[in-house]
Structure formats: structure tokens, C-alpha cells
Amino acid sequence: MKKVLFLFLLVISFFRGFLNASSLYERIINKETISVGTEGIYPPFTYHNKEGKLTGYDVEVARELAKELGVKIKFHETSWDIMLTGLKSGRFDMVANQVSLTTKKRQAAFDKSLPYSYSGTIMLVRKDENRIKDIKDIKGLRAANTLSSTYGEIAFKYDAQIVSVDSMAQALLLVAQKRADLTLNSSLAILNYLNTHKNSPFKIAWESKEKDGGASFVINKHQEKALELINQAVQRLINKGVLKRLGEQFFGKDVSQP
């Protein structure tokens, strides 16, 4: 009897907590704290500086968004492969990590804000690699990419063998060690890497002619009122020149326009 009563009270407690949990919209309206998922190992978008502080273009845009909304912000660092799962489970309210929502499955589960940056795709290979002149040439070759990323999807589309990695840094290491033949990533990330590593063993083998659909803040579906407030805040950041300033800080140019 005591066991049954305990289980009953446990269930009641769970549902009471569930019902009392505020929505993202309510937290914004009440000027509370919003939580943001990000990698923390993907420069120049999300990384730790020499002082150990979490920073990067996406991180600083998220901080400016919080200021614009009048809320506090808390970051949760997690690997890309489980980031959207963490969002779906409610571990955090949104994701700021160069997300474009390119697949129908993701589009069915999540919504994205107005874009805050645009980028193309670059393929990086070793300087002694001469087999690749076009994206179609990667068929059968080893692509070091995160399985669930946009770039992993591109490599899979063109029949490359995916060598699973957790980060761009790991991908570059595998290519340098000849354990992979290539890696695909954001043109902004690749150009930043090459600019800060003048003597790297890599070269650009291919670059997309078009930019992506834009990176955005991503939230769970069915939060239209919260999304509207976020979109309004992003638009104000654009209008005030905040995104332009951050783009110039991290990339030397405005990346908020297609």
C-alpha cells in the first residue's frame, strides 16, 4: 500500500512540475533566463578564447539577442550529434550553432528564426591531393564529417564514405593524417582556419557557387509566439547594425546578408 501511495505521489509531482514549467514565450515575457545549446569547439562561431571565455559569432549574436529580449542567457555546451536531440528533449530552449535545417525531418520537428549569417561550402584536402576537381569527384573517397551535419549530408549525397567525427578540428586532423581524403565545411569556418594557419597542409579543392539558406536560432515546433518575438529581435539587431558589427569583428565583413 505504501509503495502504491509513493508511486501515486511521484506521478502527481511529475505532472505538477510539468504543468508549472513555463514555456519559452513565458520566460521571454517574464524576463527570465533562456538556455542555448552550442558546441563551444567550432571557431569562429562558438569556441573558447585564450582566457577560456565562451565566445564566437553565434555566441555573441545569442548574447545580443538576449539583451534585445531583456532576458538572461545560459549556454549549454554539447556535441553537434546530440544537440538537436537535447533541444527536442527540453534540455535547452534554442540552438545557436550555424544551423540551417536542411532536411525535411528536421523541418518537421523544429522552427528557425530569421537568419543571422550566410555562408557557402568549401572542400578542404591535403595539398598533395590531385584527384578532386569537383564535388562529384568525391564518390568513393573518405569524407571526414559529422554524420548529422549539413556537410555530412552533402558528402553522403555524392556517395563519399563518411568518416564520422565530432568536430571540424578532428576532421582536419584525420585529413592531415591521411585517414580521410577530404572534409566539407562552412566557407566562413574554413577561410578563418586558413587565415589563422598560414602553414597548414591543406588547400581548397572545391567551393560552392551559392550560399546556404542562412544560419538561424532553432527552437522546437509549436512555439509561434516565442518565434515571433525572436524574429522581431533579430530584425532589430540587423536594423541597428549589431550583426554587421559582429560580422566585421569575427570575419572582417558583414555576413548577415545573403
Protein language model annotation of sequence segments:
Residues S22-S23, T150-V163, P201-W206, Q232-P258:
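Ligand-binding clefts/hinges and TM-proximal coupling segments of bilobed small-molecule sensing domains
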Residues E32-T55:
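Short glycine-rich His-centered loop
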Residues I34-S35, V71-K72, K88-N97, Q177-N185, ...:
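Alpha-to-beta junction loops
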Residues G40, S117-L124, S187, L191-Q235, ...:
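Periplasmic-binding protein-like
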Residues V59, R63, K67, K72-D137, ...:
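Acidic, polar ligand-binding/catalytic clefts
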Residues E60-E68, K136, R142, L147-T150, ...:
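Extended ligand-binding regions for polar small-molecule ligands
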Residues F75-T85, N130, S148, V163-Q177, ...:
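Short helix-initiation/N-cap motifs at beta->coil->alpha
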Residues T85, V99-Q107, I154-K157, L172, ...:
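A ligand-binding cleft/hinge motif common to bilobed small-molecule-binding domains
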